[in-house]
A protein has these predicted regions:
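Long insertion/accessory domains within large nucleic-acid-processing enzymes
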Residues: 1-4, 9, 77-284, 288-747
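Intrinsically disordered, low-complexity, charge-biased terminal/linker regions in eukaryotic proteins
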Residues: 1-81, 89, 93
């Protein structure tokens, strides 16, 4: 039974959807059968297959020959089926939201189409109606499926943001109150209490909770959504910091060298099913060829099925989706087996970043107020180097003029700007610097009709303005250039260059970490890189190992995200245990060493007896798990109560300090810290807020960066920043900000 907050009446879920809508609105809604006359007219319209959205056929099963009635009915039934899924609990006010977003535009579409058909019948015969009356001056169908609130640009920065966006829900409230934002008790197990935006939409935009496998108790629902389920020791953190950690996970970039986290949850393994770049085999058979663009699988009947894979594919957020084949020629695969794996995954486990050796201590003011000090090793060895890919399309319209040989000869334009097939082929594979032009084209300047310019050879012409397509970042590599004509790829020739309708340029590259980039942990601990020190100047452990990153201790007590300290200590245990097992190898001594640790844990961790017994039995039978052969990872249940006594037990068994702390040596000051410093391994994410994306174009007056981040521009220093510096009498800084010395650019 469903209870509405305004009417207070019980509604039977088996009622007709129109009856429920009528109950909510108090109005009368006509059924589809009432418009049978209009639908008869629509059924006889000549539909063109290439005008239908391809997504409709894939998602809703819409065919090119379907009528308007069939299209709307299929979409209606599909959405209705998803909302009535028994696995999804009843959400407070969900039905009213559903009809406001889905049913209202549908009824509006019927009304609009009725007017269009009746008006068109005055000017056309019955057979003269075509699809153009819908996509011409009145694009009604397009506005329903492309401009509706449910039609959104997918956030695919990483698998977490993609999975979270697909599970997002929002209340359509014009003026939400505080009562609307409060987490209702009926949401538990259906809507996540943690993940929500930090903006004015807080509590209004929500996310469905995700299912998970609980080793302690079999339950049908999980309380948190997908991003919070990736935070180990979630119950050790303040909820506000968990919210920030969830949002940071959705902003992490794919790294060139990502590794397993030292401490993971169950959903790090389940994430494999959330990303579309993990391509599965459509049929069972034998792999016959593995290439850079496709994999071929030969079935039992002798047919070869090609499976396309992606190389330097650009997502909506310009992240690089490069898939790595996981099979080789001759392998036997079944339907559903993984063929390729994206860079977000290693052996089926989600790897958002790489664990770094971290130490918590104030360091000479460089990590004041959430600033971060990192080692030069992270730059030189590409540990925090992110990859990007970008696609630019130059579409030719009536005003776009490409400087071909004939065009340059007619209008006396420099031969340096000539573009032909040889020039295009020579640009493929080039590495460009930031601001270096890749293509030139011209647009005519609109002038008064009687104003004509005479060129040297006597031809009259209008004035042309030169437009450049330039590289946005350093070390931009041109991967491919395509000539397209009506979405068909043409061969790069001079003849095809004159008749193509667009040119597609694919570039890719890497971003090394630098001062000003934003880093974050999974527990909501975030900051910007303020100093990159040489490896010789980084603090050192007692055994001489330099740390990778130095964080400030003042960022923990007031934020109350203590889960990062548990992850820090267990990460140190994981790395130490890996080194011990690597030293012992697959010997009786190594198996005995691991078995004794599991026996100790069995006495301390009560609910996991069965799991630990299986591991001990495997070791007794001479089996070593696949994880131990490559790395040692602690798999933590989401809300498992791990006490400090358990962590101390593991540290003590491995011969490490119980407090996971030691006196560090500071080479910069040639002294040892007076107090112990806690150290270990934390997962550090590199976020999409990079400093090289923030400072781009500048205005003419104050030489400040222009706004509009989407146009490859950056942030500008406004009046309030100027006042703040003025109040501190920072004249030198103001001089740098407001004059030409604020950036390294010409003229």
């Amino acid at each position: 039974m469903i209870r509405h907050q305004n009417y207070g009446t019980d509604l039977d879920p088996q009622l007709s959807q129109y009856d429920i809508f009528k109950e909510y609105t108090g109005g009368y809604v006509k059924s589809i059968s009432a418009n049978k006359t209009i639908m008869d007219i629509l059924s006889n319209i000549d539909w063109e297959s290439n005008n239908l959205n391809v997504i409709l056929s894939k998602v809703f099963g819409v065919n090119p020959g379907d009528s308007i009635e069939e299209i709307v009915e299929k979409v209606h039934s599909q959405v209705k089926q998803n909302y009535n899924n028994p696995a999804s609990k009843s959400i407070y006010g969900r039905e009213a939201l559903y009809y406001k977003i889905i049913e209202s535009p549908t009824q509006w579409l019927y009304k609009e189409l009725t007017g269009i058909i009746e008006k068109s019948l005055f000017f056309h015969t019955f057979k003269g109606l075509s699809w153009n009356i819908f996509v011409g001056k009145s694009p009604r169908i397009r506005s329903l499926f492309l401009q509706n609130k449910l039609s959104q640009w997918l956030e695919d920065t990483n698998p977490v943001s993609e999975g979270s966006h697909k599970r997002r829900i929002a209340y359509d409230l014009d003026l939400p109150t505080n009562d609307d934002r409060i987490y209702h008790s009926s949401y538990r197990g259906t809507v996540c209490p943690i993940e929500t935006p930090e903006s004015g939409k807080i509590g209004i935009v929500l996310n469905y909770a995700s299912g998970y496998r609980n080793t302690n108790k079999d339950t049908g629902y999980n309380i948190v959504a997908l991003p919070p389920s990736l935070i180990p020791f979630l119950n050790k953190n303040d909820a506000n910091r968990c919210l920030m950690g969830s949002n940071m996970l959705k902003q992490s970039l794919p790294l060139k060298k990502s590794k397993w986290s030292k401490v993971i949850t169950e959903n790090y393994i389940n994430m494999y099913n959330y990303h579309w770049t993990n391509i599965k085999s459509p049929v069972a058979g034998v792999v016959t060829s593995v290439g850079t663009n496709r994999i071929r699988v030969k079935t039992g009947s002798g047919e070869e099925i090609p499976v396309e894979i992606y190389t330097n594919f650009s997502g909506n957020k310009k992240t690089n989706y490069t898939t790595v084949p996981k099979v080789k020629v001759g392998d036997r695969v079944e339907a559903g087996d993984i063929l390729t794996e994206s860079k977000f995954f290693k052996s089926g486990v989600y790897t958002p970043s790489t664990p770094l050796l971290a130490a918590y201590l104030p360091y000479n003011g460089y990590n004041f107020e959430d600033s971060i000090v990192i080692s030069q090793r992270l730059v030189d060895e590409d540990i925090l180097t992110s990859e990007w890919a970008e696609t630019e399309t130059l579409t030719f319209d009536k005003e776009t003029l490409l400087p071909t040989q004939g065009f340059c000869d007619d209008y006396n334009i420099s031969q340096d700007w000539v573009i032909n097939s040889e020039v295009i082929k020579s640009k493929i594979g080039q590495t460009l610097h930031s601001g270096e032009p890749l293509f030139h084209y011209f647009r005519p300047v609109k002038l008064v009709d009687d104003f004509i310019v005479k060129t040297d050879n006597g031809y009259p012409q209008n004035l042309f303005s030169l437009v450049d397509i330039r590289a946005h970042y350093d070390d931009s590599r041109v991967d491919a250039i395509y000539l397209l004509q009506d979405n068909e790829i043409l061969e790069i020739t001079d003849e095809n260059l004159n008749k193509c309708t667009s040119i597609v340029i694919c570039t890719s590259g890497c971003h090394k970490v630098e001062e000003g980039d934003k880093l974050s942990g999974v527990h909501g601990n975030k900051g910007t890189v303020s100093k990159i020190l040489p490896v010789d100047m980084m603090p050192r452990l007692p055994d001489g190992t330099p740390v990778d990153i130095v964080l400030n201790t003042m960022g923990i007590p007031s934020r109350m995200n203590v889960g990062q300290l548990f992850e820090l200590s267990l990460g140190l245990c994981s790395e130490t245990l890996r080194k011990r097992l690597e030293e012992y190898g697959d010997t009786d001594k190594g198996r005995e060493y691991l078995r004794n640790l599991l026996v100790l844990l069995k006495e301390e961790i009560k609910p996991n007896h069965d799991l630990l017994d299986e591991l001990i039995e495997d070791i007794d039978n001479g089996l070593v798990t696949k994880m131990v052969n490559t790395d040692v990872v602690f798999l933590m249940p989401q809300f498992q109560e791990i006490t400090t006594s358990v962590v101390k037990l593991i540290l003590r068994y491995l011969g490490l300090p119980e407090d996971s702390a030691a006196h560090l040596y500071l080479p910069e000051f040639d002294e040892t810290t007076k107090r112990k410093v806690i150290y270990g391994y934390n997962t550090i994410l590199k976020l999409e807020h990079m400093v090289k994306k923030k400072t781009k174009a500048r205005c003419n007056g104050l030489n400040n960066p222009d706004p509009t981040f989407e146009e490859h521009r950056g942030q500008r220093s406004g009046e309030m920043e100027f006042w703040a510096l003025e109040s501190h009498h920072a004249t030198a800084t103001i001089n740098e900000m407001l004059k030409y010395t604020s950036g390294n650019y010409q003229n």
